């Protein structure tokens, strides 16, 4: 763990009346916020021979190592931190000027370079020139079970149950799943110029059909610690995400200049979202993987005397920022039955996307209420590197906890109702 002191963005808090941006009902007071964020724009995590075999064109180079956060990705995250500071000032949670009080803001990050740097960039945007510690587990060379208890052996998947659940969501089989998405696969083949690829030309010489789904059959693989898909589905998810990362990185010709409108982006990223729908949002997977984060979120949102937790943070606190991965957002969505699509953003779990949990207190009776939302930069905001503020905000989608039995006039779920939903979603064997 280290304290950082980063002069990144000047903190300009406009003197805007609180009522313009805070809750319309003045009897509600914001008391605590938990933000679970995907890391920012990164380089691809791998460069495989298969990636080259499916296109005649060379893949562009990146300015950082595989899987690392790019400097531009850090800037985009800092913009989100800057926006959140303005919003939290408007809602009365943070002061307009100066650094947050000691312990008022806590940041936890997974051990990867891209997540640690995301925590630093968010801190730089939220509180420039302030020493804020980015906490990780002590051993940064090993996976952190907070973000994946399966990978670390805390708990195991039930192979038969998970297989049945995923195949049911797929429509009966993975072949059915790919069959219903041929339009999107054809669009990917067009962007790749797949007919001129080594893989396709080789198949044609052998009088074999040249399509991604036939050349690369997909198979579901379930083990005690992971679920995955092989073949065209897995490849398509990775490649379409890479195209989006190219666009967000500001590269001159994402997808070799062959992606030109929002319809094409939505069609391509539907393949990425579809894989996440199967592998990360299926409740039989999501509930296990999300349990440690659910426990942490519940602890952070529940009023109680301050207690020091793992990572050295004291909870509850005003703001808890957790820098993780797209899988974490999808797992939490699947476990809590939160569903969303993002206007202007084809990726349902985009770089820098934030699943935000807020606890509000009703002043008339001190009752506690939970609001959940998804805050995200649109693809155009990423492309243009648009600075964010209350006047130029990121996208935001308010989410509904389907199982909540008690709501207030603003649609928030009671803290008791939220706690019950979390307790029913979590898998005790996967707790830390």
Curated annotation (Swiss-Prot):
Span of the signal peptide: 1-22
Key words, A-Z: Disulfide bond, Hydrolase, Periplasm, Signal
Practical uses of the protein: The properties of the phytase including the low pH optimum, protease resistance and high activity, demonstrate that the enzyme is a good candidate for industrial production as a feed enzyme and is therefore of potential commercial interest.
Activity regulation info: Contains three consecutive and one non-consecutive disulfide bonds and shows a strong dependence on DsbC for its full activity. Competitively inhibited by tartaric acid and by sodium fluorid.
Effect of residue 46 to A/G: Retains 40% of wild-type activity with phytate as substrate
Annotated effect of mutating residue 38 to G: Loss of activity with phytate as substrate
SUPFAM superfamilies: Phosphoglycerate mutase-like
Reported temperature dependence: Optimum temperature is 55 degrees Celsius for phytase activity. Optimum temperature is 60 degrees Celsius for phytase activity.
Pfam families found in the cross-reference section: His_Phos_2 (PF00328)
Induction notes from the record: Induced by phosphate starvation, anaerobiosis and entry into stationary phase. Regulated by the HTH-type transcriptional regulator AppY. Negatively controlled by the cAMP-cAMP receptor (CAP) complex.
Record function comment: Catalyzes the hydrolysis of phytate (or myo-inositol hexakisphosphate, an indigestible organic form of phosphorus that is found in many plant tissues) to myo-inositol and inorganic phosphate. Dephosphorylates phytate in a stereospecific way by sequential removal of phosphate groups to produce myo-inositol 2-monophosphate. Also shows phosphoanhydride phosphatase activity and hydrolyzes the distal phosphoryl residues of GTP, the 5'-beta-phosphoryl residue of the regulatory nucleotide ppGpp and tripolyphosphates.
Matches recorded under NCBIfam families: PRK10172.1
Name used for this protein in its record: Phytase AppA
Source species: Escherichia coli (strain K12)
Encoding gene per record: appA
């Amino acid at each position: 763990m280290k304290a950082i002191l980063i002069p990144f963005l000047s903190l300009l808090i406009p003197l805007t009346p609180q009522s313009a941006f805070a809750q319309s009902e003045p009897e509600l007071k914001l008391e605590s916020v938990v933000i679970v964020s995907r890391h920012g724009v990164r380089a691809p995590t791998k460069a495989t021979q298969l990636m080259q075999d499916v296109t005649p064109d060379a893949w562009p180079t990146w300015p950082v190592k595989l899987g690392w956060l790019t400097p531009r990705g850090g800037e985009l995250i800092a913009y989100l931190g800057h926006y959140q500071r303005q919003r939290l000032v408007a809602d009365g949670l943070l002061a307009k000027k100066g650094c947050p009080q000691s312990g008022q803001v806590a940041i936890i990050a997974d051990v990867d370079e891209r997540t640690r740097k995301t925590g630093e960039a968010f801190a730089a945007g939220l509180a420039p020139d302030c020493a804020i510690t980015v906490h990780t587990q002590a051993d940064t060379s090993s996976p952190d079970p907070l973000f994946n208890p399966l990978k670390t052996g805390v708990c195991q998947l039930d192979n038969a149950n998970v297989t049945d659940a995923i195949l049911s969501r797929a429509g009966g089989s993975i072949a059915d799943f790919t069959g219903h998405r041929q339009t999107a696969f054809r669009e990917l083949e067009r962007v790749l110029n797949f007919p001129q690829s080594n893989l396709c030309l080789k198949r044609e010489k052998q009088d074999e059909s040249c399509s991604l789904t036939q050349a690369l059959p997909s198979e579901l693989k379930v083990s005690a610690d992971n679920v995955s898909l092989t073949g065209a589905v897995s490849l398509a998810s990775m490649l379409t995400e890479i195209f989006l990362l190219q666009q967000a990185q500001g590269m001159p010709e994402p997808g070799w200049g062959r992606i030109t409108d929002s319809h094409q982006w939505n069609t391509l990223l539907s393949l990425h979202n579809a894989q996440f729908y199967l592998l990360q949002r299926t409740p039989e997977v999501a509930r296990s993987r999300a349990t440690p984060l659910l426990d942490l979120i519940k602890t952070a949102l529940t009023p109680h005397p301050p207690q020091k937790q793992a990572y050295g943070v004291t909870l509850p606190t005003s703001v808890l920022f957790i820098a993780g991965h797209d899988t974490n957002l999808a797992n939490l969505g699947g476990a809590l039955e939160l569903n969303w699509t993002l206007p202007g953003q084809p990726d349902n779990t985009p770089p820098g996307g934030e699943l935000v949990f807020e606890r509000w207190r009703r002043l008339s009776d001190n009752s506690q209420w939970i609001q959940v939302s998804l805050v995200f930069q649109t693809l155009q905001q990423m492309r243009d590197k648009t600075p964010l503020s209350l006047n130029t905000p990121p996208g935001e989608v308010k989410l509904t906890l389907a199982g909540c039995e008690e709501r207030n006039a603003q649609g928030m779920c009671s803290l008791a109702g939220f706690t019950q939903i979390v307790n029913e979603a979590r898998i005790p064997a996967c707790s830390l």
